[in-house]
């Protein structure tokens, strides 16, 4: 999980999701997981 100021999709399978007021990226590739700080 990378914590970043700006999250964006890295590949086609990345999905942007809002959870508990935070923006997250979930993907089938675990390296692409991100969360907005």
Swiss-Prot record:
Q: What is its main location?
A: plastid
Q: Which PROSITE patterns match?
A: RIBOSOMAL_L36
Please report any disulfide bonds recorded for this protein chain, giving both cysteine positions. none
Record Pfam families? Ribosomal_L36
Q: Where is the signal peptide?
A: none
Q: Name one GO cellular component term.
A: ribonucleoprotein complex
Q: Where's it found, cell-wise? A: Plastid, Chloroplast
Q: Which InterPro entries match?
A: Ribosomal_bL36 (IPR000473), Ribosomal_bL36_sp (IPR035977)
Transmembrane region(s): none
Q: Which SUPFAM superfamilies match?
A: Ribosomal protein L36
Please name the GO terms that the record assigns under molecular function.
Answer: structural constituent of ribosome
Q: Which family does it belong to?
A: Belongs to the bacterial ribosomal protein bL36 family.
Q: Which HAMAP family match?
A: Ribosomal_bL36
What protein am I looking at?
Large ribosomal subunit protein bL36c
Q: Which organism is it from?
A: Capsella bursa-pastoris (Shepherd's purse)
- Name of encoding gene: rpl36
């Amino acid at each position: 999980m990378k914590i970043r100021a700006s999250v964006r999709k890295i590949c086609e399978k990345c999905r942007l999701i809002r959870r508990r007021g935070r923006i997250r990226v979930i993907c089938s590739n675990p390296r692409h997981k991100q969360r907005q700080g």
